[in-house]
Amino acid sequence: KMTLHEKLGQLNLPSGGDLVTGNVNSAELTKMVRDQEIGGFFNVKGIRKIVDLQRIAIDSTRLGIPLLVGADVIHGYETIFPIPLALSCSWDTLAVERMARISAVEASADGICWTFSPMVDICRDSRWGRIAEGSGEDPYLGSLLAKAYVRGYQGNNMQGKNEILSCVKHFALYGASESGKDY
């Protein structure tokens, strides 16, 4: 049975700091894993670092729960593909699925098990800065491509070693920004 501290720790998902400027206290992150104060990371890059953190989570904690390691794998990981808005112009769901599959293989090889993609906001104001992450203003096209992204990232049953979890984002009506404001 999990303690309250362990349950709260599982809800904590800090940035690992690899994709930010400035100093990152790796010793503090390691201590947080050992003390079961986190359930995962995002923005951690590098298989060695991720494997070391996973080993601590599994071997040095009471419950041995693996960490969720997430990243914004929006249009590729090591191989960079066109942005989602550009991909949507093709109406080619198979190409989108292949892109997501390649991205999943590359990200999972680096220890990533979760992506914050696809973005399914229906965007109607081209001034909004996040419009490039989505499929534009057509709900039908957006639904077809979202399905293709998820199939590509997750495969058929999430049993393969090269599959990653897909987290469809954002919130209802987040894409209905006014005057291009990101609120």
Language model feature labels by segment:
Residues K1-Y183:
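Glycoside hydrolase catalytic-domain context in secreted enzymes
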